[in-house]
Amino acid sequence: MAKYQCPDCEYIYDEVAGHPHEGFPPGTSWETIPEEWACPDCAVRDKADFVVIESGSASPASGAATPEVRTATTPPKAEASPQKSTGASTPSANNKAKAKAKAKPARAKSSKDSTGKETTFRKWICITCGHIYDEALGDETEGFAPGTLFEDIPDDWCCPDCGATKEDYVLHED
């Protein structure tokens, strides 16, 4: 079984682990993934852009740097990779810059819960594609009832539009 890496965000698809959230159970080979599939973290790169980083039982050459293995549930490194483009001309950099520009403290809606305490609802925006999660509305198609706070969503949840991780969401103001 092999591992394939997105050249933009360094997400790694591991055939052994699969990616159940994307519908690929453990053991799903790279060849069976549809050609139109895109990186679930950045949605910028298509399957054809991925590079093989580990194949079968082959091990990296001695003395060679071993790439960070990051799966759908592992957050990215904080520091930038020297091989990644950091210019604002890349599509993912443009998308993230636009979303971060909008990332201001959210004007909150509020309501009282069953105990009489005031609950403040906020909106969260995906920095990759701009999807907005509104706590007041929830997302019934994802199984989150109205009033479900973002912090109560499981950590392995991904953006329903682009597949980005929960860590790729920031507070949003209308």
UniProtKB/Swiss-Prot annotation:
Region (Disordered), start-end ranges: 56-115
Pathway participation: Hydrocarbon metabolism; alkane degradation
Claim: Transport is one of the keywords in the record: yes
Residue ranges constituting the Rubredoxin-like domain according to the UniProt record: 1-53, 121-172
Cofactor annotation remark: Binds 2 Fe(3+) ions per subunit.
Subcellular location: Cytoplasm
GO molecular function, one term: iron ion binding
Similarity comment text for this entry: Belongs to the rubredoxin family.
Name this polypeptide is given: Rubredoxin-2
Organism, as annotated: Alcanivorax borkumensis (strain ATCC 700651 / DSM 11573 / NCIMB 13689 / SK2)
Gene this protein is translated from: alkG
